[in-house]
Amino acid sequence: MGVKHEYSGSQGRISIFFGNMSKAPLTNVRAVIDEVDHLRVQKTGTQGLLDDDENGGCTVAVRTQARLLLMVEVAAPFDDAPAMRVCFTTPGGEVHEYPLRLPIVATCFMEPVTLEPEAFMHRWKSLEGQDRECQEVIKTPPDAPPIDEEYMKRIVKIVTEGLKFGRCEGCDTTPWTVSGASTFRTGAKDLKGNNINVGCLVRVEANPTHGAFRVTTRTLHPLCSKAVKNVALVSIKLA
């Protein structure tokens, strides 16, 4: 499988390719995507690929591909990637089924915001409590290098390029903290016809002595707080 995806505001375009590198055709190839309330999804693909019938599907000849295109728009905050099942039959009649997750996470729909230190801290304090905060401590892997300036550069890259947050410098006197701000875009409308968006803040605090990071997120919606924290934790584990 191969995936290409791009996002702008509350919308995304995801292209998925199912290639057959075996020595025989694959039959009854299907991609079944779970319906979710928080995403509006338009699906197109190779004829038969999106069949609901277990006996349907398409045939992928040797060294060819089936293709699936998803056009998505966010309707509400979410904290879990949509599920997809890929099913196919190999020669001899053996049926294979693989549960997967689509690479569609909340941080794909973020728009970076840069705040001055005073503005950041004011918003940070205003988002205390009411299930707006998520926090978790993560240890670096046993084979990870010590947390130093080079390591922190990778953390900055995670926050700015991975999470798509604007870095807010000057919020701390210590070099071991990275703060950022962003806006989660949705296609939903309020009563005045304006798009509903969610302001999001994040702080990643390093503890070089104990080889650990504390990730804290505060947003206007609990699911956004959880989603940003989860993506940050996974990214830091892979840093």
Question: Predicted segment positions?
Answer:
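A structural signal for beta-rich interaction modules in eukaryotic proteins
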Residues: 1-239
